[in-house]
Design a protein with these regions (language model features):
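Short, charged beta-turn/beta-strand-edge "cap" motif at the junction between a beta-strand
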Residues: 369-371
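Short amphipathic alpha-helix that is part of the acyltransferase structural core
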Residues: 27-77, 82-118
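Conserved acetyl-CoA-binding loop-helix of GNAT-fold acetyltransferases
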Residues: 164-179
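Internal, well-ordered domain-core segments that constitute the primary functional module
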Residues: 146-163, 172
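Conserved acyl-donor/pantetheine-binding loop and adjacent beta-alpha core of acyl/acetyltransferases
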Residues: 107-154, 221-223
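Short beta-strand-centered segments at strand-helix junctions
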Residues: 337-362
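Extended, composition-driven regions rather than compact fold-specific motifs
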Residues: 99, 110, 144, 187-334, ...
């Protein structure tokens, strides 16, 4: 989808997976490498986006190329303002160079030019003396933010790779927080992630059918596509008064704020590092938002910078820690999940590991624990 006015639900911000077939990766000290996306990745990323059959990533080649170009400018710091930043990452098999997944950071989701719309969930309690009955009603109120948080999203993992011991979905998820910890000045103080909700077999939203469609006259896909270009209709047509969920069908009520099957793993990872349900949901499909202050995210709390040193101690290979490290290489930002021994400001690594990653002794890397 186009990058400036991306909507939330099945947008660049949502987490999901796609299917394809791949051969098992060759043996390597580092089976997978994470890096910033380049224009040469466009065709492969486009294939993933089209297999997904949503607008998690643009399915139009020109839109995807524009996204990658903007991402490259973001990594190079060549933007008018940091709020324009959009960072697209890929994970590739080190030997075959096959791309197995993507992830993204949107530096600021919610600006005067492109507001962040969401539905806030709240509870209204009422008591009748006559009936001697108490009612607690959940209601939804449309909210608008023009000074929004950073958003992590765009997490796509090819299921053919999901069972590998390297846990590439986890690598992609944690990578975004590693990058935010390395470059905190590029991002907001709070971070959110929108999760894909349950959808029908046709990838339609029951919530939209009962809510958005009745006030816009648009079907789900048409509204989703329009919102990537212009959000005016959300502001002018969606109800500004609270909507009581008890007025909706029971099956729709049960889906509000719930996570779809394809996003369960992503939610588990986010909860593990400190993100929590904000009681905010997407106004199109009622997908939930999770969030936290960046400084309170466990990975960011434990972020460290190290100088690389070859480990000549002969210590046991199982000594050390599992880490996700990031660095700026000759071709831009790269990262990898490794096993090494941190001591103070030094990271002791096997020589074969540094060689595989084209790293040199004395280089500085950022690192977070691979929990």
């Amino acid at each position: 989808m186009p990058l400036t006015n991306g909507r939330q639900s099945s947008s660049l911000g949502a987490e999901s997976v796609v299917a394809s077939e791949v051969s098992k990766p060759a043996v390597s000290p580092i089976p997978f490498l994470l890096r910033e996306a380049t224009l040469t990745d466009a065709i492969t990323i486009l294939r993933l986006a089209r297999l997904l059959d949503s607008i998690n990533l643009p399915t139009d080649k020109s839109d995807l190329v524009a996204l990658i170009r903007r991402s490259q400018r973001s990594f190079r710091g060549k933007l008018k303002t940091r709020q324009e930043g959009m960072y697209l990452f890929v994970l590739e098999e080190a030997v075959t160079r096959k791309i197995a997944g993507t992830a993204m950071i949107i530096a600021k989701h919610g600006t005067p030019e492109s507001p962040h719309y969401y539905l806030e969930m709240a509870t209204d309690q009422r008591y009748s003396k006559t009936l001697k009955t108490m009612f607690r009603h959940t209601y939804l109120t449309l909210r608008r933010s023009i000074d929004g948080p950073t958003e992590v999203g765009g997490l796509i993992v090819d299921p053919a790779f999901r069972q590998y011991p390297a846990k590439i979905g986890k690598q992609l998820s944690f990578l975004r927080f590693l990058y935010m910890a390395m470059y905190p000045d590029r991002f907001e103080d709070e971070v959110i992630a929108e999760m894909m909700p349950p959808l029908t077999d046709n990838k339609e939203s029951l919530f939209w059918e009962c809510y958005g469609k009745r006030v816009t006259g648009l079907d789900f896909r048409a509204a989703d596509k329009l919102s990537t270009k212009d959000k005016e209709f959300i502001e002018t047509l969606f109800p500004s008064i609270p909507i009581y969920t008890c007025m909706l069908p029971v099956e729709v009520q049960k889906q509000i704020g719930q996570v779809g099957a394809s996003s369960q793993g992503a939610v588990h990872l986010l909860e593990k590092i400190g993100l929590r349900f904000l009681r905010h949901v997407d106004p199109f499909d009622a997908g939930p938002y999770y969030g936290a202050k960046v400084e309170e995210v466990a990975l960011v709390k434990h972020f460290r910078r190290y100088r690389l040193v070859i480990d000549r101690s002969g210590r046991e290979t199982d000594a050390g820690q599992n880490l996700l490290i990031g660095w700026e290489g000759s071709k831009g930002f790269c990262a990898a999940q490794i096993h090494a021994q941190p001591e103070a400001s030094v990271l002791f690594c096997p020589a074969v590991l540094l060689k595989a990653l084209h790293l040199k002794e004395g280089m500085e890397v950022g690192a977070v624990p691979f929990l």
